[in-house]
Amino acid sequence: MELPAGRVKRSQGSVTVERAGQTRAVEVGTPVYVGDRVRTAADGAVGITLSDDTLLTAGPGSTLLINEFRFNTTTNDGNLLATLLKGTLSVVTGLIGKQAPQNVSFKTPTVVLGIRGTEFIIEARGDGE
């Protein structure tokens, strides 16, 4: 069975995850997998901790897609690619970003961000689809 990329650590308001064509409400402890689309409503926010200790915090009205995530807990090797389709995302990088920042990227509808720091905020405007 596939291991989750991470878990929801904080959830406020209306937050859902779309996985394999099904949409479910999110609560603290909900696993997040590669391919999941996490959405926050206008009253929602969500904090996700990935298995390399990366912290992703999506603000109200956001849509976040986890495109790729791989992390080896023995060697700390891995990669992360996520897309912020709309809204805001605060990021504190974990072990992958600290040891191999070239392996961490975030996309928006208009740009691809390569990471060289450890904390940053991304905003994407648009319809999020």
Give the residues covered by each predicted segment.
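Flexible, surface-exposed loop/linker segments and immediately adjacent secondary-structure boundaries
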Residues: M1-V38, A42-E129
